[in-house]
A protein has these predicted regions:
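Glycine-rich, charge-decorated loop segments at or immediately adjacent to ligand/cofactor-binding or catalytic sites
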Residues: 36-47
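Extracellular ligand-binding/catalytic regions of CAZymes and related secreted enzymes
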Residues: 108-116, 124-162
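Stable alpha-helical elements in mature extracytoplasmic
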Residues: 14-17, 40, 68, 147-151
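Short glycine-/acidic-enriched loop or helix-start segments at secondary-structure transitions
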Residues: 11-14, 39-41, 111, 142-143
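Short alpha-beta junction capping motif
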Residues: 1-38
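Histidine-centered active-site/metal-ligand motif
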Residues: 32, 55, 137
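Catalytic beta-strand/loop cores that center a nucleophilic Ser/Cys/Thr
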Residues: 50, 54-127
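Proline-centered loop/turn at the N-terminus of a beta-strand
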Residues: 27-29, 98, 129
Length: 162
């Protein structure tokens, strides 16, 4: 699990070990600035799905759940209103990943991805499982029961436990 990492966090030996772990069926969960990490490592770029571009100030927005059959989203409301720091991405990951939820840019200011703004996604990647959410910047996120349940289910999914 990469929880709010930024920049280069693994050296070459650690990267090789991490790649072996994933290729042997290991799971990965990325939270928030995990998308602002390891820009020069192609394997990680594919694993994370999309890299961070920028963000507006923290504000309330509506998340629309697209895939409510995934364990991490099954217990969430179809329209989930949360306050957080909302990331824009360098490219849209749709097509490379299974988009679980999108951000409704009509409900906040500062979005740059228009009508299709994925905010959480999952995929199988080179033998392992990868799950990412752009949520989780604020301390309040980790006191929010729905967010914690969502994150816990994502961890279990990535581990292959559900």
């Amino acid at each position: 699990m990469f929880l709010s990492t930024t920049g280069d966090v693994l050296d070459a030996l650690q990267q090789a070990a991490f790649e072996r772990f994933v290729r042997r069926g290991g799971g990965f969960v990325g939270v928030h600035s995990a998308a602002d990490t390891e820009y020069d490592w192609a394997f990680y770029g594919g694993l994370i799905g999309a890299y961070f571009s920028d963000h507006p100030d923290i504000q309330t927005a509506t998340i629309h759940i697209e895939l409510d059959s995934h364990p991490s989203t099954a217990s969430l409301p179809r329209a989930w209103i949360r306050r957080d720091e909302w990331y824009n991405f360098r490219r849209n990951p749709r097509g490379a990943v299974s988009v679980l939820a999108t951000l409704d840019e009509r409900t906040y200011s500062g979005g740059t991805m228009a009508l299709d703004h994925p905010i959480m996604w999952a995929q199988t990647y080179e033998g392992g499982r990868s799950w990412y959410t752009a949520g989780g910047h604020t301390a309040e996120s980790f006191a929010e029961a729905q967010f914690l349940d969502h994150l816990g289910r994502a961890i279990l999914w990535a581990a292959g436990a559900i």
